[in-house]
Structure formats: structure tokens, C-alpha cells
Amino acid sequence: DFFEYLLCLYAKNLNFSLEKSQEIITLKVQGNEKAINEFCTSLENMPNSVFVRDFKVQALENESIEQSQIQKNFAKKDFLTSLNSRAYQEKGELIDNEWGEFVNDELCFDGASFEPISRANFNALLDESVSRLCTEQSFFVKNELGVYEIELFKGEWQKDFLMATDIKAIKSAFVCSNENLKLLASLEKPLIKLRFSAIFRSKYQLEFNEFRLKLPHNLFFFALGEKLFEKNVNFLAFTKRENLGADFEIYELDKRLIVLNGLSFINQKARELILSKDDKNMARISYILSRFDERALLLELSQNDDDILLVDKGANLLRLDLPHNAKQLYADICADEVGARLFENYKQNFKLLNGEFKVKNNFFSLLGLVGQMLGLDDETQKAAHKLLELSDSSKLPRGVKIDFRFKENSKEFDYTRTLRSTMSFMLAGVEASNIAYGAVESLVYFLRDFYDELRKKGLAEFAIISGSLFECKSLTKNTLKHLKNCKVSDVPLFI
């Protein structure tokens, strides 16, 4: 919607036609040489969008163009673009962006009342914000996604995300590729989880490797960042105090955009439909499936809900029943003679799990049980996150083969085989990082085999990844690699 609007805006003085398919926008323009050159020059100022994966310009000969009549009511947003940022930076001018929007945020300094940002109060609010931050005080900002408390970053990590005051500040703490830098600076200003540099991680003695970061999203925060960067402030810390909508978060993997969270940039009607439902995740799933005519296998793998393997809006094809305590777990493992012998050997060499488990019937919880066996953490959820972090940081070409399979002559998943193979590799002295990556990789092989069987029966033509478990990059990368014709939706993985 936003990119389509920009194309129409830049072509408004030309005869033009605009055509859209599901993934391609084609703009044809016609005019004299001067007008065409001016149009091409204007494209240089067009903001980069995370959703535009390719952009081509070519000359057409002897082709008539029927003028498009654009009747659409385009969505508007207070984007930071080269138009308003350059006017401020070079001339000190406060102007609207291409959508006729200035700044839609509201500020609060007293903890009680919010004041909308306007041209009249812009500089006064900017000076007050800088003054408060530099005296180690916080203030609040409100927009359509919620209320955030903002303060200087002081090495405290109980925050939701950081904002770099300038693009040059990023390298002081993070390792950022050119691709990620381009995404951060895009029109949408997404959140991206970046890896810390070794020096920064050592300075703060961090036990984690990544943190969420963004760049200023509108003119006010651009101006605020500019003033703070001049004072050698590199980052602001944001804590969300009231949630009205998820922040837009992405990552890129092998030239594919993965939208983790945030509904700000999907089809407006789809967003309204999803948000109107009590079960928003199921509404999101229904919308994803409605966009495809062919039969699809939806891989809905979650960190918070039961997993779903769904074909053509039918019943869940995955039956996964995990144990809720250690007693049940070890009883299931020892149900046959082989498992009993393995258990006796294992308990002589490793500490056994005990107590209750907080699990859902999903692969995230199963990976958490593997992580608990590896001693990554005593809590299933935390152990799962640490196992996924190990997997994502692994440099191994392949991991050990962990057993993921259904029970014999059944469509019920046999979780004991996964844990038994983990125990066997631990007894063999295999490192935790190898088992962690192997578990994620082996899960993908299980999904591939399940999918291939459906393809052979003509029940599925392609697969779609969905769900918060695909926040794990090694899982997503292997899934896209090993499952033929596997698609990524531009709808968020989870809500």
C-alpha cells in the first residue's frame, strides 16, 4: 500500500498505468524525455521498503498506456523519509512527509497527561526530552502501538528494545551486515535482533548473544537521535508500558524476508478481520490459507500453543502428547527393555530431571526437555530458548541425528524416542551444541518426511511456515532448504 502510493505520487505528472498481482507491481509511464528523466531522478529519493525484494526499470517502445484512475484511499503514516529528514537536517525546516503526515506521537513528562507533537511545540518538546534524558530521567511516548517509557541505555537489559541514535552508533555494540543495515534504515523501520560484538559482550559480561534494535521511525525521534549522538549517546532504551499492538519485527534469511510480529503493514482489511476475532492466531492462520488456491501444508509451530500440522483447513494431523512431570517421562522411557537398560546406564552418569514440567504439546517444549537433560536450565521454557540459541550460533555443517518419529503403526508422535536418542548421545560424550543443532535439524527432517508423504498422495502441493518457533533461524533455514516448494507468508509468524 505504502509503496504503491509512492509510485503514484512520483508519476502524477505523467501518463501512467499501474498493475498489481499478488507479488508484483508494474508501473508504466509515458512522457517526453525531460519528464521521464525527472521521474527517474525522483525515484532515487524513494525510500527503500523491506517488502520490495527486487526493482527493475526498462524502456518500452511503441506501447500505448491507458491512464490509471486511482480511487484507493491509501493508508497514511508519519514515516521518516529523505524528504522530511533532509529538510530538517539541511534547513532546520519542519515539513510533512510524502503522505502529508508530520509526527503522530504524543509525549508525557509528568506521568499523567500526553501532549501531541506539532510544529508549534516540536522544538520545545525536543529540548525537554534531551534535558530529561541527559539528567537520567525518563519520559513516555504514545502511538498506535502503545505507550513506551524511554531512557538512556545504561547497560540494563530488562528492556524491550534499543533505538540507535544514529546509524553510525550501531557498530559500537553490534555486528551488523550491510543487508541488515539496509533493512533497519528502510521505510518501515523494523525491529531486528542483532548479535553483539565480542568486545561489547565482554564489557558487559553478557550471557546472551543478541538484542532487538531499531532506528528512529519519525522526524521527532530522528531529531532527538541527532542531538543525543552529538552528546556521545549511542542508544535509547524502550520499555513498553501499555500494549496496543505488536511492534513490527523481522529478519532476513537467504534473501527471504521473515516477518516475526506486527500487523502494521499487512492488508488493512485482513488486519481488521484478524483483530476482530477472539482467537487472533487462528484468524491469522485462516487468512494465510485463504491466500492460496493450491493445497498447502501449514507448519504452525509455536512456542506458546499446541503445534498444528494442517492440510487444506482440515483437522490437525499432529498428535503430540508430552509428559507433565519427570515420573511420567521416565516411566514412558522405561516402557520397554531397551529403554529400561538405557535409563539404568544414564542415571549412573547424569542427574535426573525431577518435579513438574510446564509444557504445551509442541516441539518447543520437547526441545526444552532435551535442553533440560543437557543441563541448559531447570525450567523447560528457558532450556528451550537456550537450546535454540545454541543451534543458531552453531557453525557445524550438520548435527547428530536425533530421533523424531511417530509410534509404530500409529500417527501419534513418539517423544520418548527423541529423549532416548538424546540420552544415548550424552552417554557417548557428544557436546551439547552438537546435540542442540542436531535436534533442530532432525526436527526438520521429520517435517520433510511427513510433507513428502503428503505430496506423494497428492494431498499437499507446497508447505507454509508459520508460528513463533520459526523465530529460530537455524530451524527456518533448514526448513526452507529441505522442504520442496516451501513458502513464507508476509503475514506475521505469530500474534
Name the predicted role of every residue range:
Residues 1-495:
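Acidic, glycine-enriched active-site microenvironments
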